């Protein structure tokens, strides 16, 4: 029996899903899903186990996810900001034959000749629910999301139903989520932060209010009027909500915000505390199916700056470069182990990320205090997190260095008031090339959020003793010595 069916049996008339001015109970969700199942049965072969989805947040995407899971399909979630080249790589790497896209994406998708493109449009017919019900198998792959990693080569993360289930249970225990909660989802469903909210709904029986895009005015109005008890945010969203925070505050039913997706300025958290907004900082990634370390509501004010403690059944340790466990307050690499953590990447990429005894090497640096609260020092050392999106410098550097006229490139993150951080590029040219030419190539090969916001020409790069680029010097006044003026 699927998670949706269980909720229908328990609470058929309980509110389940809100989108714009529409609402559905769990029973009504199941009835709507039956139409979508019938639609996709007409275009997908039973033996086709993997399907790609390409859409911004919509009710159609939500129902498509549930319908395709009912049909036992593995779902490849594609970021709608990807360029044609990036889409092509992921579709080929995942060996997907069919991509289901929102109507507004059809023109772009028609340029991809090696897949069958199907519109995300429901057809008006239905089947008996028992005819298409699939037995749930927690070992099955539920979703695939690509993450670039430090190599710049995107890797498909294989997220199984058991990983999602453990994540939902851990969140329930940490945050006290019940069927009476309504989780506001203004983050993309193609990100783990968004999809995990759908899983929590199915597992815990809470309702979801989905937004097609984040609008701080609309979210604020909904929180004022009691239309949501919890919301997931990244730093950029939190800043925007603070800018329009009403004098009267939010509804008494509001529990708090779950903050993820990168660093936030301590003064913003202090503002939240002053206004009485509970904010739970958390730590997680695509490979852990959302947060695996988080604060509790009661600890939020006492442990500002900490990502919290491990959630239910999760283990964490800090090790040095030799793999030896570090004592408290000693910085080292963060290793994770537990049911939330995936067991591998698609096509067996980078198996060395997992130790022989099952620990996942995050590549992130941090330390634990005496009470085992985690403090992050850096994320993948060079990872740039901009508005909740991960940008891996290596990926951007590879695009820049493929441009005729660029001999070398280095990309770093610079602090930004709006986005938290933005990518900035330093290049060495070996022939005449203009800034406009570089920007044109970046716009063709990189999603908008990955494109360098500033590009500087250099005569040379600072180097370490071993000959590597000393990128940290680009983040100080020392960079002036290497720029062409």
Swiss-Prot record:
It is an enzyme of class 6 (ligase). PROSITE patterns: AMP_BINDING. One of its GO terms (biological process) is menaquinone biosynthetic process. It catalyses: 2-succinylbenzoate + ATP + CoA = 2-succinylbenzoyl-CoA + AMP + diphosphate. Keywords: ATP-binding, Ligase, Menaquinone biosynthesis, Nucleotide-binding. The keyword Nucleotidyltransferase does not apply. Pathway: Quinol/quinone metabolism; 1,4-dihydroxy-2-naphthoate biosynthesis; 1,4-dihydroxy-2-naphthoate from chorismate: step 5/7; Quinol/quinone metabolism; menaquinone biosynthesis. Signal peptide: none annotated. Pfam families: AMP-binding, AMP-binding_C. GO terms for molecular function: ATP binding; medium-chain fatty acid-CoA ligase activity; o-succinylbenzoate-CoA ligase activity. InterPro entries: AMP-bd_C, AMP-bd_C_sf, AMP-binding_CS, AMP-dep_synth/lig_dom, ANL_N_sf, MenE. Its EC number is 6.2.1.26. CDD domains: OSB_CoA_lg (cd05912). Converts 2-succinylbenzoate (OSB) to 2-succinylbenzoyl-CoA (OSB-CoA). Belongs to the ATP-dependent AMP-binding enzyme family. MenE subfamily. This is 2-succinylbenzoate--CoA ligase. It comes from Enterococcus faecalis (strain ATCC 700802 / V583). The lineage of its organism: Bacteria, Bacillati, Bacillota, Bacilli, Lactobacillales. The gene is menE.
